[in-house]
């Protein structure tokens, strides 16, 4: 099949690779290059960069719905368009008469919106998955053609879940394209009574007071926000982003110390919460690199026994 691929984020990389191997990708459309890093160097999206490596024609429009770009994309006369983490809304005029499907990072109708993977982790869900849907006027409300699910591990962060869900993409996209080619594709209408929203993340959500939340809530929020914005705390006099934690039970929490209202960091990374305790596994000092809690404390043994206090991230 002739495929137009519209995507920007790394979530679509496994599916793009699979499509190149099994179909004819006639064009890739991605977001424009953006400044990145300390040097603010113009950098292509992960999809645009990989497409260029594969020798695929790449367009990077500021607005894919602009008349000239619309004509160019439609001019490929593809059999199907595959849309994954593209970042622009596709107009009715662009999609008119086109078979287009979208890979979404949740089991729809749950978690429609911008941050489905992070919200599933933050809500403490036991499982999540991906859905292949038709494109509709309302966000993520199209017909569901296929789904695939997987459990969310107790230590998994939203980054972990993102990467694992991305690997489910080729299977479900391949299934849908095959059924479309055979004329047997049927979609299921979403149950609006079960629809939930996955609103965009904000820096304000990254402030966490471990003395005021349970270990379960702390684990879910910290692991869900690990990539951005990250839950930052002050341990002694050092500001640290908590990247990965696990629950270690109420009994564990009873053995942990506290000073005033603030819990203390134990040598094994355990910190008491309002109910139970968490064990910090990975951290990133502000301005530094990510490391295990062991590596962090080996270089800063004075922080063992120090209070862990909430701080608001910059710009919150």
Where are these regions (language model features)?
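N-terminal beta-loop-helix "entrance" segment that forms/cooperates
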Residues: 34-54
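Acyl-group handling in specialized metabolite and lipid biosynthesis
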Residues: 199-213
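N-terminal Rossmann-like dinucleotide-binding module
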Residues: 1-39
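An anion-binding loop in the catalytic cleft
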Residues: 211-316
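Donor/substrate-binding cores of folate-linked one-carbon enzymes
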Residues: 80-197, 204
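Internal alpha/beta domain cores that form substrate/cofactor-binding pockets in large enzymes
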Residues: 2, 26-27, 57-76, 81, ...
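Structural motif corresponding to alpha-helix initiation and N-cap regions
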Residues: 13, 41-44, 66-70, 114
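Short beta->alpha connector loops
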Residues: 8-11, 62-65, 86-89, 248
């Amino acid at each position: 099949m002739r495929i137009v691929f519209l995507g920007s984020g790394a979530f679509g990389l496994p599916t793009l690779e699979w499509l190149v191997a099994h179909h004819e990708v006639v064009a890739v459309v991605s977001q424009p290059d953006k400044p990145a890093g300390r040097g603010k160097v113009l950098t292509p999206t992960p999809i645009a960069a990989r497409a260029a490596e594969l020798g695929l024609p790449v367009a990077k429009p500021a607005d894919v719905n602009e008349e000239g770009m619309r004509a160019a994309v439609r001019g490929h006369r593809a059999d199907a368009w595959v849309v994954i983490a593209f970042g622009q809304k596709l107009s009715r005029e662009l999609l008119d008469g086109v078979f287009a499907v979208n890979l979404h990072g949740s089991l729809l109708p749950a978690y429609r919106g911008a941050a489905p993977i992070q919200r599933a982790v933050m809500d403490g869900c036991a499982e999540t998955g991906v859905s292949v849907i038709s494109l509709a006027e309302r966000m993520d409300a199209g017909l569901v053609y296929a789904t695939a699910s997987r459990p969310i591990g107790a230590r998994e962060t939203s980054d972990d879940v993102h990467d694992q869900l991305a690997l489910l993409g080729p299977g479900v996209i391949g299934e849908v394209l095959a059924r479309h080619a055979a004329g047997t594709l049927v979609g299921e209408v979403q149950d609006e009574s079960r629809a939930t929203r996955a609103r965009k993340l904000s820096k304000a959500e990254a402030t966490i007071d471990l003395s005021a939340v349970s270990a379960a809530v702390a684990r879910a929020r910290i692991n869900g926000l690990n990539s951005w914005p990250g839950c930052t705390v002050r341990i002694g006099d050092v500001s640290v982003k908590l990247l990965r934690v696990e629950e270690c039970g109420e009994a564990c929490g009873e053995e942990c110390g506290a000073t005033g209202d603030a819990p203390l960091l134990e040598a094994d990374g355990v910190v008491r919460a309002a109910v139970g305790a968490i064990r910090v596994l990975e951290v990133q000092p502000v301005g530094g690199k990510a490391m295990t809690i062991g590596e962090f404390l080996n270089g800063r043994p004075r922080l063992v026994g120090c209070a862990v206090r909430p701080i608001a991230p910059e710009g919150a």
